[in-house]
Amino acid sequence: DERPELGRYTNPGGSPSVVGSFQYYLFEKYIQPAKERGAIPILVTPIVRRDLGNNYTGESGHITETVTNEEGTFQGGNYAKAIKQLGVGKSVTVLDLTTRTKDVYERLGAQGVKERHAWTSQREASIDNTHTNQYGAACNAWFIADELLKSNCNLKNYVVANPQVPQFTEA
């Protein structure tokens, strides 16, 4: 996790051999166990967080600064980049949702993508800039299918060719 809290934080700058690094946990807790069980692991970079200023070069793009607080110093870094590096290093397919969502969010702007996000009330101030609703999830699933079809992963043979782009409908 990228939060600067002792129980949650993983260092985005460490390699898969560095205990406590983000890559270490992805490899040890997900990739290696999946491979041991005969599964084909796939890494997916995180979607960007909706940003009212349309800036995805910082935390909205999962790029953090080094933080020092009462619990210690937490090294910053680029989590999507760490996932991509791990995929290359371990020969695991990586689907880049960070870039896909960043491109769409920059093009449409914060107002243009608000219908993809969860709302806790009817007020626009209640939009959850991190979590998506059903429509946003369908859009992200479409990105995953599209990215998988472009990959060299054998699992692409199980994806419907030319999946239909999700359409937004008012509830």
Locations of the language-model features?
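N-terminal secretory targeting modules
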Residues: 152-171
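Alpha-helical cap/lid subdomain in secreted, periplasmic
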Residues: 1-134, 138, 142-157
